[in-house]
């Protein structure tokens, strides 16, 4: 479960807040959509929820733990794919070998099943 409590955030010295006293609760096992116009704070909220930004006020709790603390046990369950990102110049196999240890719940079997579903193999280059 993710709980957002009275979250307020603004970038730099901007007077207008991107989020102000925002609260919500997301239950485990549910699927949610985040809709809004460009520049209304959707990405900012996701970065706050992942602990990558710090709010001016309020808290984000993931399984009861404040995400600002960035505990490894908390981070191993979190995945955030930004809108734009750079992939390293390695094969998928190399990428998995380097990063899978950080995610104890990572499943080679599930990855291989997904690759088969899309007629791909782990030797593809990122």
Task: Describe the function of each predicted region.
Residues 58-69, 73-74:
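Conserved ABC transporter NBD signature motif
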Residues 12, 53-55:
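A position-specific signal in ABC ATPase nucleotide-binding domains
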Residues 1-21, 28:
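A short, flexible loop at the N-terminus of ABC-type nucleotide-binding domains that lies
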Residues 32-37:
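The feature captures the beta-strand-to-loop junction immediately N-terminal to the Walker
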Residues 82-126:
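ABC-family P-loop ATPase nucleotide-binding domains
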Residues 10-14, 62, 103:
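Conserved A-loop
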Residues 50:
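Helix-to-loop junction immediately C-terminal to a conserved catalytic motif
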């Amino acid at each position: 479960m993710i709980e957002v409590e009275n979250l307020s955030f603004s970038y730099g010295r901007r007077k207008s807040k991107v989020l102000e006293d925002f609260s919500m609760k997301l239950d485990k096992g549910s699927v949610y959509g985040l809709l809004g116009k460009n520049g209304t704070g959707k990405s900012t909220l996701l970065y706050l929820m992942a602990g990558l930004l710090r709010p001016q006020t309020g808290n984000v709790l993931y399984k009861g733990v404040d995400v600002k603390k960035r505990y490894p046990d908390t981070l191993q369950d979190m995945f955030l794919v930004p809108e734009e990102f750079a992939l390293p110049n390695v094969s998928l196999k190399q990428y998995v070998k380097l990063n899978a240890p950080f995610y104890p719940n990572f499943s080679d079997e599930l990855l291989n099943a997904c690759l088969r579903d899309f007629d791909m193999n782990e030797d593809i280059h990122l």
